[in-house]
């Protein structure tokens, strides 16, 4: 009797690394000459980051700094979903950045369809905000991982619980 192997596909990020990236971004913003007087603030909520700054120019610079610091901390830039820019009081601009965590049902269906179309001996099932993939051969599972890494999904994918 051959046992089956499996792994889970999830979309997650390390919150502590995000906190560190935001902290480093705030330090750089306070030290940079072009952003020193912009009175910029980055506020981390449960699943959002609020950027409050003086102008569109400084908002673009904050985007660059935040993305650079996140990339250096090994965070995928796909976790950031930049919302629309709103005007705030006192000629300031504000932007909400949603943090993407978990795989939506729509994207989970795309992943399972891709797996079922290309790998006949592999089973996949949606379990909440994760996708469980199982097969008899570990080589097939590794082929699935390589195929999913090659595909460009709108969220970062991690492979966990490899058994």
UniProtKB/Swiss-Prot annotation:
<keyword id="KW-0547">Nucleotide-binding</keyword>
<dbReference type="InterPro" id="IPR036183">
    <property type="entry name" value="YajQ-like_sf"/>
</dbReference>
<dbReference type="GO" id="GO:0005829">
    <property type="term" value="C:cytosol"/>
</dbReference>
<dbReference type="InterPro" id="IPR035571">
    <property type="entry name" value="UPF0234-like_C"/>
</dbReference>
<dbReference type="GO" id="GO:0000166">
    <property type="term" value="F:nucleotide binding"/>
</dbReference>
<dbReference type="InterPro" id="IPR007551">
    <property type="entry name" value="DUF520"/>
</dbReference>
<dbReference type="Pfam" id="PF04461">
    <property type="entry name" value="DUF520"/>
</dbReference>
<comment type="similarity">
    <text>Belongs to the YajQ family.</text>
</comment>
<comment type="function">
    <text>Nucleotide-binding protein.</text>
</comment>
<dbReference type="InterPro" id="IPR035570">
    <property type="entry name" value="UPF0234_N"/>
</dbReference>
<protein>
    <recommendedName>
        <fullName>Nucleotide-binding protein Tery_2743</fullName>
    </recommendedName>
</protein>
């Amino acid at each position: 009797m051959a046992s089956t192997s499996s792994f889970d596909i999830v979309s997650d990020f390390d919150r502590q690394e995000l906190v560190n990236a935001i902290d480093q971004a705030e330090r750089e913003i306070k030290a940079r000459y072009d952003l020193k007087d912009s009175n910029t603030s980055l506020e981390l909520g449960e699943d959002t980051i609020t950027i409050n700054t003086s102008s569109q120019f400084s908002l673009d610079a904050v985007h660059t700094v935040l993305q650079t610091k996140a990339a250096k901390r090994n965070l995928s830039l796909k976790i950031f979903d930049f919302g629309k820019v709103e005007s705030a009081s006192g000629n300031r601009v504000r932007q909400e950045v949603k943090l993407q965590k978990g795989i939506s049902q729509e994207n989970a269906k795309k992943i399972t369809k891709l797996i079922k179309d290309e790998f006949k001996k592999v089973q996949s099932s949606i379990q909440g905000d994760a996708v469980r993939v199982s097969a008899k051969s570990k080589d097939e599972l590794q082929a699935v991982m390589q195929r999913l890494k090659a595909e460009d999904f709108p969220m970062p994918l991690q492979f966990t619980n490899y058994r």
